[in-house]
């Protein structure tokens, strides 16, 4: 993925036409509301959209632009985080308008919803203009307060077959294979997912890609650490070592293409540390939410390790995961 949006600049603007009156009887400017008007919708929301071809995940962060205005940030089923162009909560109705990124629509995405108990519920339109339902659950806290005890390391890859793994889709046939302990895809391909799921863990994985290729490692199947041919380039959250669209690496430790490289990644709650080729490039940073391409948005659940296989040629070896107890 190559669209470049700086990860932490969560900026949006609100356009609304309604005028309100404050408790002092003074009219508020258009687009503004009394303080505290949107407390029920503020925060991080894990969305599930009930698409016609099956459910898919999205993510929404609603926060204050100022006391009387809202702004929002959104992650769809693919792509990276983007800012909404309109965010409003009026008479119990939430409206979020989001610019198209990789979707096929010719008009902006529009999510309409309301608070139902401790959830959000609403509708949007799919790429063919069909109305579909969506629900939102509040995302869990970023990390655990308990000390982590580590179990025994697990070798996730054997020497000769795909035992313990499954393809996300077989529409293009079986496109992953293992030979002499090296896992390789043939393009076009699909993502590869472990049968086992994990909560907190330490991961070691070695990888190699040809020039201009692209892949990724999805932690719990939800948070992509980017793999890309980016040696010598300025750092960015969309480039090698970044948590896609959210967290840029501190430095570029990428080797040239066609060389074996190594990730050592620790994930505890939503806090992540990434070591690339022996250099710490992300240290105990909080991942705001799911990244595009995630398997689901259930951030509080254990999840698998997923290797991205639908973007380019990639090889992996020595995949070792140490789970928490």
Regions found by a protein language model. Give the residues of each.
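Carbohydrate-interacting regions of secretory-pathway proteins
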Residues: 27-36, 40-44, 49-325
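N-terminal secretory signal peptides that target proteins for export/translocation
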Residues: 1-5
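Boundary at the C-terminal end of the N-terminal hydrophobic targeting segment
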Residues: 21-27
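N-terminal leader/targeting signatures
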Residues: 6-9, 194
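Bacterial N-terminal signal peptides
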Residues: 8-19
């Amino acid at each position: 993925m190559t669209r470049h949006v700086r990860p932490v600049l969560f900026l949006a603007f609100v356009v609304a036409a309604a005028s309100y009156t404050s408790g002092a009887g003074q009219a508020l400017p258009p687009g503004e509301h009394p303080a505290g008007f949107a407390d029920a919708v503020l925060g991080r929301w894990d969305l599930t959209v009930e698409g016609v071809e099956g459910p898919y995940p999205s993510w929404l962060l609603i926060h204050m632009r100022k006391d009387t205005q809202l702004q929002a940030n959104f992650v769809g089923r693919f792509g990276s985080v983007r800012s909404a162009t309109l965010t409003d909560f009026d008479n119990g109705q939430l409206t979020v308008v989001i610019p198209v990124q990789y979707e096929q629509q010719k008009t902006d995405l529009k999510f309409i919803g309301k608070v139902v108990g401790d959830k959000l519920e609403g509708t949007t339109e799919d790429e063919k203009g069909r109305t579909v339902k969506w629900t939102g659950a509040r995302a869990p806290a970023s990390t655990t307060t308990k000390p982590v005890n580590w179990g025994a390391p697990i070798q996730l890859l054997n020497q000769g077959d795909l035992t313990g793994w499954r393809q996300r889709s077989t529409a293009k046939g079986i496109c992953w294979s293992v030979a002499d302990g090296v896992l390789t895809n043939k393009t076009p391909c699909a993502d590869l997912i472990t049968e086992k799921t994990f909560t907190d863990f330490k991961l070691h994985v070695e990888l190699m890609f040809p020039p201009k290729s692209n892949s990724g490692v999805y932690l719990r199947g939800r948070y992509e650490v980017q793999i890309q041919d980016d040696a010598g380039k300025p750092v960015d959250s969309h480039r090698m070592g970044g948590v896609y669209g959210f967290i840029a690496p501190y430095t570029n430790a990428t080797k040239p293409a066609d060389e074996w490289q190594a990730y050592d990644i620790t994930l505890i709650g939503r806090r992540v540390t990434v070591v690339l080729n022996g250099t710490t490039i992300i240290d105990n940073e909080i991942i705001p939410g799911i990244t595009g391409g995630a398997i689901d948005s259930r951030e509080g659940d254990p999840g698998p390790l997923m290797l991205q296989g639908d973007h380019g040629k990639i090889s992996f070896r020595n995949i070792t995961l140490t789970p928490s107890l």
